[in-house]
């Protein structure tokens, strides 16, 4: 099996997925990955690929990379309940994106002020197709 490396789509502090407070993410049930704690408010594409899903609430985005990796970037925990408030999308579903391209912006202070965590899981949803998955903070620099 091929090993892969994923650069972080956000600036912040990289933490193990097991430290995310939502059990669906922490358990790995939604995919293998890592999370970014205390993120700044910009999400960039960690890969060249295509936007496969952009939630209407703009809190989560899926990307299929040019080399076959399926990623889900989910800003915060339970932030779907904000119904798009404090989020701005810079891409649409079906768009081709380049590594480093701005995807989403969000206001982490406003989200936290409304009582939501901003820790952002970054998941490989087709992780069974890969061996070791390494996450780095390189992409968000």
Predicted stretch roles:
Residues 1-141:
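Contiguous, well-folded functional domains in the mature portion of proteins
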